[in-house]
């Protein structure tokens, strides 16, 4: 049976560094929905993304449940294949001496570094997405020399290259 919700949270609470960052969250997100979360700083938007990516876990209580892609327990490798996230944490992990071509290529492998043995097929995928996003001119530029806008679009291309089911953009 197909579940139309890829994210289904009922009454979840999460703590981070001893502080409650999510309180009694009830939220369902369907596959067909585009969602924008708006709120003041400290309201839990980025923490929700950490829950979705399984970087933090909710407190388990009788009344609560959390399903991602219809599963209460999901393999992290499956999750990483199906969800791509672009946020400041990702931007800070990127080697500043990586060229944009290699940055985007690294998204296929879920790494943040230079990939030595790239196949022709993978190189073609990178060239294709760079052309589609109109950033082919950035191919040989180093990440550290890009403008903020160029960094963001390059990171979005990196996230999209693996064709995720879900794309999450945090402060992009």
Where are these regions (language model features)?
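Conserved structural motif at the start of ABC-family nucleotide-binding domains
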Residues: 7, 21-24, 139
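The feature captures the beta-strand-to-loop junction immediately N-terminal to the Walker
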Residues: 38-40
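ABC ATPase NBD coupling module
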Residues: 68-84
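Conserved ABC ATPase signature
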Residues: 117-118, 142-146, 150
């Amino acid at each position: 049976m197909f579940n139309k919700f890829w994210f289904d949270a009922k009454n979840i609470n999460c703590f981070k560094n001893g502080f409650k960052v999510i309180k009694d969250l009830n939220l369902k997100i369907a596959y067909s929905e585009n969602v924008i979360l708006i709120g003041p700083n400290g309201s839990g938007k980025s923490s929700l993304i950490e829950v979705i990516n399984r970087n933090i876990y909710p407190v388990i209580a009788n009344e609560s449940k959390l399903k991602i892609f219809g599963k209460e327990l999901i393999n992290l490798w499956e999750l990483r294949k199906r969800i791509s996230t672009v946020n400041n944490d990702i931007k800070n992990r990127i080697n500043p001496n990586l060229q944009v071509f290699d940055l985007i290529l690294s998204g296929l492998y879920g790494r943040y570094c230079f990939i030595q043995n790239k196949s022709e097929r993978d190189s073609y995928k990178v060239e294709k997405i760079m052309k589609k996003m109109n950033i082919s001119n950035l191919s040989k530029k180093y990440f550290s020399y890009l403008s903020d806008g160029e960094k963001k679009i390059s990171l979005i291309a990196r996230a999209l290259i693996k064709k995720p089911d879900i794309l999450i953009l945090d402060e992009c």
